[in-house]
């Protein structure tokens, strides 16, 4: 099975339509990967589905980079 980091990066690449090598840990969804607000909402929904978790809106607003998404999922896995 893939690591959480690999799974998060794969989802981000697929959701934002960017090459996997562009999805670096310190990449910002908006500034580096070209996401808009709708993209980020869809990304959070995809992460929730993949990891069977719920990300509250106030937490989702803080997830603005690849590393932040990885850290959140790592911290909230059952």
From Swiss-Prot:
Pfam family, one: PP-binding
GO biological process, one term: response to xenobiotic stimulus
An annotated GO cellular component: cytosol
Localization: Cytoplasm
Phosphoprotein keyword on record: yes
Modification after translation (UniProt): 4'-phosphopantetheine is transferred from CoA to a specific serine of apo-ACP by AcpS. This modification is essential for activity because fatty acids are bound in thioester linkage to the sulfhydryl of the prosthetic group.
Signal peptide limits: none
Positions carrying O-(pantetheine 4'-phosphoryl)serine: 37
Top-level taxon: Bacteria
Carrier domain boundaries: 2-77
Pathway this chain belongs to: Lipid metabolism; fatty acid biosynthesis
UniProt keyword list: Cytoplasm, Fatty acid biosynthesis, Fatty acid metabolism, Lipid biosynthesis, Lipid metabolism, Phosphopantetheine, Phosphoprotein
InterPro entries noted in UniProt: ACP, ACP-like_sf, PP-bd_ACP, Ppantetheine_attach_site
GO molecular function, one term: acyl carrier activity
Chief subcellular location: cytoplasm
PROSITE patterns: CARRIER, PHOSPHOPANTETHEINE
Summary of subunit composition and partner proteins: Interacts with MukB.
Family label: Belongs to the acyl carrier protein (ACP) family.
HAMAP family listed in its UniProt record: Acyl_carrier (MF_01217)
Function field: Carrier of the growing fatty acid chain in fatty acid biosynthesis.
Designated name of the protein: Acyl carrier protein
Organism the protein comes from: Escherichia coli (strain K12)
Gene transcribed to yield this protein: acpP
């Amino acid at each position: 099975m893939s690591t959480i980091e690999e799974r998060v990066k794969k989802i981000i690449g697929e959701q934002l339509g960017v090459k996997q090598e562009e999805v670096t840990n310190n990449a910002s969804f908006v500034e580096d990967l070209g996401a808009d607000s709708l993209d980020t909402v869809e990304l959070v929904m995809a992460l929730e589905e993949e990891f069977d978790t719920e990300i509250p809106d106030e937490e989702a607003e803080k997830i603005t980079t690849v590393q932040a998404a990885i850290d959140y999922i790592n911290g909230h896995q059952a």
